């Protein structure tokens, strides 16, 4: 299935998950789960994962990607999900920018230990940084540019993938 905005490139996912710092026994959330590839990787360590997306195609794709894993897949707005009763979320990955400031606020208020936002737009990265700073949870931001090799006339050349901003927040409360 082709889900707009995904899947997250493996190299970007590796750095994002390192920053997220999922621990054994954690309850995690992939908010704006897209294809479910990040959800699947988080589920390898976390004891339980919420995967939330408002797009029907994303939910369908995540169900396929995460079959048999400890993942609860929810179709709907992230802010609606966070506003209703759920297990306390230890770490959250945000792959989408819909209602970003409100989502970050809800996660910070809940006491989510670690939050990672991936953004391809500068404006989204700025909003994430500004919101995290206002909430007192901003840790750091990365601008990641990855290039992959490919063969060209029996030689090796590199082709860049789109750069990504990785914004990390930690809640010490």
Spans of model-derived segments:
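A short, conserved alpha-helix within the catalytic core of class I
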Residues: 99-107
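Core SAM-dependent methyltransferase catalytic element
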Residues: 155-173
């Amino acid at each position: 299935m082709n889900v707009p905005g995904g899947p997250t490139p493996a190299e970007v996912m590796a750095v994002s998950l390192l920053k997220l710092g999922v621990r054994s026994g954690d309850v995690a959330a992939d908010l704006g789960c897209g294809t479910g590839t990040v959800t699947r990787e988080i589920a390898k360590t976390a004891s339980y994962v919420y995967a939330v997306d408002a797009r029907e195609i994303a939910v369908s794709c995540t169900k396929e990607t995460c079959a048999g894993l400890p993942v609860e897949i929810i179709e709907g707005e992230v802010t609606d999900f966070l506003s209703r009763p759920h297990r306390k979320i230890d770490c959250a990955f945000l792959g989408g920018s819909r209602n970003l400031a409100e989502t970050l606020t809800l996660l910070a208020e809940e006491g989510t230990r670690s939050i990672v936002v991936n953004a391809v737009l500068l404006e989204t990265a700025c909003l994430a940084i500004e919101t995290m700073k206002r909430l007192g949870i901003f840790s750091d931001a990365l601008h990641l540019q990855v290039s992959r090799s490919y063969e060209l006339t029996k030689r090796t050349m590199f082709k860049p993938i789109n750069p990504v901003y990785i914004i990390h927040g930690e809640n010490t409360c």
